[in-house]
Amino acid sequence: MSQVSISKFGNPIERVDRAIDALVSGRGVLLVDDEDRENEGDLIFPAGNITAEQVALLIRECSGIICLCLPPERIEQLGLPQMVTCNTSAYQTAFTISIEAAEGVTTGVSAADRATTIRCAAALDARPEDIHSPGHVFPLRAVEQGVLGRRGHTEGTVDLMRLAGLAPAGVLCELTNVDGTMARLPQIITFADEHGFPVLSIEDIAAYRSQPIKKSA
């Protein structure tokens, strides 16, 4: 069990409040899950106004598998089928088929192109004809109950956007070390300190949603 803690970023309610403030201002946050689950930290940004610079940061510092987290109704609005009919992944991560914006991109792989695709698919009035498949952005379908139904980064991302009063669409990518290994909590905290990102956990979001009376004013 790691002795490193995110308590330096406040108590659970304070950590969520600080993450909300960052997201409302268009900045990113780092979301960690349980050490006994994936034991990873995802860098998250609001999807609706994501910039090429933010996508470039995800490509440079993270795994490169940039995912767009959406609730079920938005996935259905876009007409996106699941990547597989029988999901046998360890944590039931609900990938749909990958996507590309139908217009405004070239090869689709650059940071600018991926930002265009994300903004296109995240638009409240987005339609199936606005996107093509396959592509270089990977949508994820959150469960309807959010983190109260599944303790995943996908659900945490969508819940955070809703708590922030934003459209329920967020981008995530797993933070990695320079050597390509997955960043664990000590490296995640160091990265957060260096770049000024708030850190919170999926359990923080569950506590925030379950005990709204304890939200700070």
From Swiss-Prot:
Q: Could you give the cofactor binding note from the entry?
A: Binds 2 divalent metal cations per subunit. Magnesium or manganese.
Pathway, per record: Cofactor biosynthesis; riboflavin biosynthesis; 2-hydroxy-3-oxobutyl phosphate from D-ribulose 5-phosphate: step 1/1
Q: Which GO terms describe its cellular component?
A: cytosol
| Domain of life from the UniProt record | Bacteria
The cofactor required is: Mg(2+); Mn(2+)
**Molecular function GO terms recorded:** 3,4-dihydroxy-2-butanone-4-phosphate synthase activity; magnesium ion binding; manganese ion binding
Q: Which SUPFAM superfamilies does the record associate with it?
A: YrdC/RibB (SSF55821)
Q: Under what name is this protein listed?
A: 3,4-dihydroxy-2-butanone 4-phosphate synthase
What is the purpose of this protein? Catalyzes the conversion of D-ribulose 5-phosphate to formate and 3,4-dihydroxy-2-butanone 4-phosphate.
Q: Which family does it belong to?
A: Belongs to the DHBP synthase family.
Binding locations of D-ribulose 5-phosphate: 37-38, 42, 150-154, 174
Q: Which UniProt keywords apply?
A: Lyase, Magnesium, Manganese, Metal-binding, Riboflavin biosynthesis
Q: Does the keyword Metal-binding apply?
A: yes
Write out the catalysed reaction. Answer: D-ribulose 5-phosphate = (2S)-2-hydroxy-3-oxobutyl phosphate + formate + H(+)
Q: Does the keyword Ribosomal protein apply?
A: no
